[in-house]
UniProtKB/Swiss-Prot annotation:
Chain sites annotated for binding ATP: 41-48
Principal localisation: cytoplasm
All copies of domain Helicase C-terminal, residue ranges: 432-594
Pfam families hit by this protein: Helicase_C, ResIII, UVR, UvrB, UvrB_inter
Protein's recorded name: UvrABC system protein B
Keyword Cell wall biogenesis/degradation: no
Annotated Helicase ATP-binding domain residues: 28-185
Free-text domain note: The beta-hairpin motif is involved in DNA binding.
Keyword rRNA-binding listed: no
UniProt family annotation: Belongs to the UvrB family.
Domain (UVR): residue spans on this chain: 629-664
Listed SMART domains: DEXDc, HELICc
Name of the encoding gene: uvrB
Amino acid sequence: MSLTNLFKLQSSLKPSGDQPQAIQKLVNNFKQGLKEQILLGATGTGKTFTIANIIQHLQQKTLVIAHNKTLAGQLYNELKAMFPNNRVEYFISYYDYYQPEAYVASSDTYIEKDSKINDEIDQLRHSAAGSLINRDDVIVVASVSCIYGVGDLKDYQKSTLHLQIGDKYERKNLINKLIELKYQRNEINFQRGTFRVRGDIIEIIASSSKEIGIRIIFFGNEIENIQNFYVLNGKAIANLKLITLFPASLYATNNQKLQESIKRIRQELKEQINHFEKTNQLLAAQKIKMRTLHDLEMLEQIGNCNGVENYSRHLALKGKGEAPSTLIDFFGNDFLTIVDESHVTIPQIKGMYFGDFSRKNNLVNFGFRLPSALDNRPLKFNEFQEKMNKVIYLSATPGDYELTKKIPIVEQIIRPTFVLDPEIEVRPTNNQMDDLYFEIKHQTKNNQRILITTLTINMSEDLTTYLKNLGIKVAYLHSEIKSLQRLEILKDLRLGKYDCLVGVNLLREGLDLPEVALVAILDADKQGFLRNERSLIQTIGRAARNITGKAIMYADCISPAMQIAIEETYRRRKIQKQYNETMKVTPTALNKTILETISIKQKERIKNEKGKSKVQKKLQINTNMTAKNKEIKRLQKTMKEAAKALDFEKAATLRDLILDLEKKEKR
C-alpha cells in the first residue's frame, strides 16, 4: 500500500453544499502549520463526510473522540462504510457494569471493586491496539475511555510475537511464550485469549478475534505450517507464511521488567508502612501490608493479581505523577484528532481526572492502596493537550473552551440536500399530551418518525407507557440500556419498528436519523443544563435532515435560552434560503443507507431467536414481566445513580440486595 495513498474514501457521494469550501479551508490551514480549528457545522450538513474527505487529504492516522457510546457506535458504522479497505476500529469502555473500589470513612465501609466485562467490546479494544501497531491506515472511533491508562506501548510492542514457516522454535518454548503473553492454556473451554495443544499442533484464539483461530503445525523443532481456521468447526481457511500475535492483555510485560516492578512495589510498601507508623495509624499500616504482600505473592507466582492496574506506574517503570500510557500513545506523534460534539466532549475530558482522584485518595489515606495507585488514572487535561497534534473541534454549538482559543472557525451551514433548518413552533403546556398525540398520529400517517425529549426519567417512563396504551409504537431510550443495544433501537426506529423515541439526554448530539420529521421538547422554558441554548439548538437539529422537519417547544413563556436557539435557527434558515434561491436549487429528501450495527453476535442472536418455539417466547415474555424482575431493574437503576453520585456505600448495599434477588429467581 502506497504511503501517499493509504486512506481511500469510497462513496457514491461528492462533496456539495458547504462541504467543498469547508474541506478546502480546513486542509489548507493544516498545511500552513495551524494545529487547531473549529468546524461549526449545522446539523445534517454532512460533517462526518467532510471529516472523511479531510482524512483522505491528510493521509494520517485519525482518532475520533465522541462523548458517549451511542455516538461512537454511529460514527464507527459510518466511517467503516466510507473506508472499507482501511482499518476502522472501535474503542470504548468494556464494562457492562462497574462498581469502583471505594472507602466511605463516615461509616468505615470498604467496598470492593465489582465489574462485568463485555467480552465483545474487549475484543474490539484489542483489535484497535493491534491495528495501530501493525498498520498506518487506521481510524479509531473512541469514547473518553481513550484517555484512561492501558498497558505501556513499548512493552506491548516488545511482547508482540512474530512467527513464520521455517522458524526454529521448540514447542515447549512457544507454550511458555504464550503464557508470558497472558494467554491461558485451556483444552476444554477454547475461547478468545486461550490456546490448546494437540500433539505437534498448537491452536490459538487471539485476543482480537473470536471466530477465527491460528493453527501452528510443528515438525520436530521447526514450524512446518501456519493456518487460520474456523473455531466453530476447525476447518482450515488458508495457509499463511507468517503471523503477528499480540498479547492477550493490554498490560503485558516481560519477566525482567516484572521483577524490577516488584522491587519498586516492595520499596514503596516499606515507605508507606513507615509513614503510617510515624503518624500512629497502625491499623492502616497493617491493612496496606496485608493487601500489598498478598498482591506481590500473586505477581511473583502468576504475573497477575486482582487490581493489577493499581500498580501500573511500577509495571511501566514510570516516575511519580508521570502521565499514564493510554491508547493515544499508540498513534505516534503525527496524527489527526477529531473531537466530536466538542462542546460536551471537552468538559467531559476535563472532569475525568478529578472524580477519579477524590475516590482513590480516600483509599490511599486509609491504607487500602499504595500512593502509586493515584497514577492509575485518566489523563489530566493539560496532558491530553500535550499529546494532541492536529485537532478539529466539531460541533454545531462550539463550547466556551473552543471559542476562547481564537482559532479559525470554518462554518458549514448549507446542507448537501439543501434542506432548511426546522421550523419552530412554541405551544402552551395546557393539553400538551393531547396535542402531542395528534401530532404523532399526523406524522406516522406520512411514515415519519418522532423524537420526544423530557426533563426527567420518571416523566419519560410515564410518557412512554401513556403512548403505548394509545397504540403508538414507542421506545424509551435511556442511559441504562447497553451501548450496542442503543444502536439497535436507533436502527429499529429508522426501519419502522418504532415510530417514536422518548428520552431525556440521549436525543441531542449527533444522532443521524433522516426519517425524523418532528422533535417535541417538553418543558422547553425550564432553566438548566438540559434546556440551555446549546442543548435546545442540538435537540432542534434532530429534525434538520428531513424536508418537512419541525420542532415544537411546549412552554408557557419564552426563556432567554429559547430566544437564542430560535434566533440562531432562523439565522441559518435565512442563509440556507438565500443560497437555494441564488443557486436555483430545491431541497431533496435524504435516502441514507441503514447500516448494520457493530454487534458481532447479532446473527447468532437472530438465529437463536428463530429457533425458539412460540411457547418459549411467550414464557420468556411472561417471565420478563414479573414483579421481581421489575424490582431488580428498579434497584439496578438506583444503584447506578448512587455510584454516579459517589455514594458507594448505598450502591454496595443495593448491589448485594440485587444479587440476593437474582439468586432467589434462579431457585
